[in-house]
Amino acid sequence: MIEFGVATAYGTMKRVLMHRPGEELQKVTDDTLEEFHFQRPVKKEKFLADYNGMLELFQSHGVETVLLTDVLKSDDDAMSYIRHRPNMTYTRDLASVFNSGAVLMGPHLKGRWGDQWIVGRALERLGVPILGSIDQPGFLEGGGVTLIGDDIAAAFPLRPGQRSRDPSVERANHG
């Protein structure tokens, strides 16, 4: 069996899909804070410094970091979309990757709806099968999913109503 993801939340990470934030951070203004779920406009230099520190930490531990925009650079539609999506940096929320493939998450925040399909395009280009997706009216984000065994996950809300809704969990059953 080809393996794509991790079997548990505590194993060794070998490869990770990430998005380096760019011009889309300028979309976070006082008028869009609620839509994109930010507390204040982004201090881009600090945000990028923190991101680069995390990227370097992964790489220093031997983790292969795959950048979303590198995978999608020839996809003009995806690249245009990303330029308007300041939360794209948080790729963990958008898919859960199992040994047999990925399940695309269903973001709760309206300002994130559709972002999972961009990550799905990248995963497909990387050869990761898409096993299913969480669709409205349900929602479930990657922060509410913990892998506990081969192709077995526990889904739970981190904060009531913020990360999952029961129909999401039912729809995530792909096997």
Each model region followed by its residue ranges:
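The feature marks the mature, well-folded catalytic cores of soluble enzymes
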Residues: 1-175
